[in-house]
């Protein structure tokens, strides 16, 4: 396998100010705080008002540029993972290029749709492209306006999701210890379990069964590819779907739950934004370089795991 030595130069995140609590849901649905919390671990979620996935992606990208005073003129690749763009074309990535004032540059910009696995997919694509030598700096974003595609009368799905965006700037590293490893995949025979038509639909029990099976498997597979053990990993950043799922994965792997970073109590499931958002949130408070596993799953089904130094 070709080595992919990359470094995360900077990260950024954005969530709308407007917060919807479980008690707020109890006023519009047959539910309550205890019911939601015990089943999901979610207490609050941020809901965009007058903003789209494009706006949130831009704000997260700008934070990533500003956090390290990064020279945005170096960026020559932009990849956005999202399932909630308000427009079919141009891509969110293309619009971020414009908002960053990079219109004069020869930049490759495109979106991908891999649902909640999207950011991990996008990082592997970016790593491969910059490692080819044809690109020098990749801006990778996960941005989701999930509230725009929810059925607000369906308590099984409406309570789960929030809006947010997370971004990372990636460059090639000259340190061989910065090799990145990936184990991504998909299957097409379960497309009727989690889908959007035109609102989010989900067979919750089947999604849970898939998630608790594929996430430990993905972690083990990516560790195997890297020639590492779980003891070589400082922490795991899982997709923030549901506390019970993460708890089950930790139990399956015989790991303390503290090894898994979480913020779903505050933000809920933000799909492709959840992993980069949590990555930036953690790095803000812990700037020292750590070796992490990113792991997620999503509609399709899709799944992805990555080992990175961040």
From Swiss-Prot:
Biological function: Catalyzes the condensation reaction of fatty acid synthesis by the addition to an acyl acceptor of two carbons from malonyl-ACP. Catalyzes the first condensation reaction which initiates fatty acid synthesis and may therefore play a role in governing the total rate of fatty acid production. Possesses both acetoacetyl-ACP synthase and acetyl transacylase activities. Its substrate specificity determines the biosynthesis of branched-chain and/or straight-chain of fatty acids.
Biological processes, Gene Ontology terms: fatty acid biosynthetic process
Family: Belongs to the thiolase-like superfamily. FabH family.
Subcellular location: Cytoplasm
Gene: fabH
Annotated stretches, region: ACP-binding: 240-244
Matches recorded under Pfam families: ACP_syn_III, ACP_syn_III_C
Recorded GO CC terms: cytoplasm
Source domain of life: Bacteria
UniProt keyword DNA repair, yes or no: no
Protein's name in the database: Beta-ketoacyl-[acyl-carrier-protein] synthase III
UniProt keyword terms in alphabetical order: Acyltransferase, Cytoplasm, Fatty acid biosynthesis, Fatty acid metabolism, Lipid biosynthesis, Lipid metabolism, Multifunctional enzyme, Transferase
Binding partners and assembly: Homodimer.
